[in-house]
Amino acid sequence: MIKITLKDGSVREYAVGTTVLEVAKSISQGLAREALAGKVNGKIVDLEYPLKEDAALELLTFNDEEGKTVYRHSTAHVLAQAVKRLFPDAKLAIGPAIQDGYYYDFDVEQPFTPAQLERIEEEMNKIIKEDIPFKRVELSREEALEHFKKQDEIYKIELITDLPEDAVISCYQQGDFDDLCAGPHVPSTGRLKSLKLMSIAGAYWRGSEKNKMLQRIYGTSFPKKAMLDEHLFRIEEAKRRDHRKLGQELDLFSIQEEGPGFPFFHPKGMVLRNELENFWRQEHKKRGYQEIRTPIILNRSMWEQSGHWAHYKDNMYFTKIDEADYAVKPMNCPGSILVYKTRMHSYRDLPLRWGELGLVHRHELSGALHGLMRVRCFTQDDAHIFMLPSQIKDEIIGVIDLFDYFYNTFGLNYHVELSTRPEKSMGSDEMWEVATNSLRDALEAKKMDYKVNEGDGAFYGPKIDFHLTDSLGRTWQCGTIQLDFQMPERFNLNYVGEDGQKHRPVMIHRVVFGSIERFIGILTEHFAGAFPVWLAPVQVKVLPITDRHHEYARELVKRLQGLDIRVELDARNEKINYKIREAQTQKIPYMLVIGDREMEQGAVAVRERGKGDVGAISVGDFIKKIEDDIQNKTI
């Protein structure tokens, strides 16, 4: 007998060779129906996997992220089988599960058409109804190569050739179809219920422009139709909220052919941007930060010393000045370090908290660019804290408190991940252990739930990542706290301690917004362009009904402008309903309609965004209301 420890901590005994599915059945038939795969000692396996020794077992359902991955990866195999049935000459490339769905890449003579996509989806549903079992078969390298050579699957042959010598090579069969795959998969195609093919796109084999362009079919799948319908609704809502679309409609920013990946901010977009930067400056000043500014271009020797030349060169832009090599900065931290080195510091000076709204440039492939979300130049709201080792915990807690205040101000929930040492890194094991434990201690002191993200730290230190959740339930990684023992060592940073001797400071790198451009994109989609009053590029639109109301309207505009309220006057000879509709389209928080009665009473008829007509009030009362909204940053 073997002992199996379940997720709830309970231990059950089973015969050697009992499968994961049999364990699920022994717990309940309902769980057996819901289970998609198992997780044995951290490894995800098929339900038919035999248990041969004591192990920890977690049964994965669609409620688990790993369960969703298995479900959608299996659907990708059904997609490949359907395409091969309908287009036998199609060559198979790869078909992974991705966030909210899956895709499969095919090499075909002609691009797929929308009509063909419908036929493929129909064929997939037939395959699901056939309830074909997924069967895992392990092959030697020679057997696998021979098998796929017979099928003339050139991409599978290339993948097999590139596998390590000791790799276990497996295929998954479903009827007369099979595919190279490590798995795992659901027991049979009948376990897959509701699916939808979403789109077709071109994709280079292995992501390289040097390789052939393939046809990529994107899809999604869910165990219930209601879940699929909800997902499709969210997608349509996301299209409506797309920051690229709203950025154009609201005249916030543009991306020009002359500068792909380099955003152009228009006057209204600059208002939004400046409000965010002002908020950032005010809150940092309250917490003892000082602002610095460092150059965009620095010489090669500095980037070699920082480690960026060795670890980050592929993402950097370069130039020459007087025949010497220079690079455009991809990060702000080396500049801050150089400022620190301009004078000797005492332990009494620390912690030093320096913030910088620094413009950085990073090379991105053209295919990866996406509005403000993925650009080649952006403003990083960096701050660097130089401190004593004894101050680490308190400083990290202070940064966490700042982040919490910022995100709550925008109505954004978040979850936290602790990212540990990546494969490509610098520094000793001991330094990494101390740094990682320091971050963990601060999170636990704040009683924060967090997930460990193994191997995703920066090359110079571990980090805490803050993932924001927007109004559509999507997550965005924005805030980061990185603890760094490496840079102070590489740049020979010192402070004079209480003992009169030189010591190494510890450094924190941190960003709240991450990228101001990207954060504007996130906020635009989160609020669907209907920004809170304090952020809105235009806060008030004054709408006189006829020409005789213009003078009163102009006086009102002048009064509001004197109070730093952002106001526009629509004095066009148009019907009032037309003016109202246009102001609504521009998502302006307040519309003030001026007619005879308002002139006589010294009042305004207020229309509030999302509420409509809320009645007439005195100008003084309206000013108090909007100033309260701005002061309190009402959402």
From Swiss-Prot:
Residues 242-532 are annotated as: Catalytic. PROSITE patterns: AA_TRNA_LIGASE_II, TGS. Residues 1-61 form the TGS domain. It is found in: Cytoplasm. It comes from the Bacteria. Its cofactor is Zn(2+). GO terms for cellular component: cytoplasm. It is an enzyme of class 6 (ligase). One of its GO terms (molecular function) is threonine-tRNA ligase activity. Binds 1 zinc ion per subunit. NCBIfam families: thrS (TIGR00418). Catalyzes the attachment of threonine to tRNA(Thr) in a two-step reaction: L-threonine is first activated by ATP to form Thr-AMP and then transferred to the acceptor end of tRNA(Thr). Also edits incorrectly charged L-seryl-tRNA(Thr). This is Threonine--tRNA ligase. The gene is thrS.
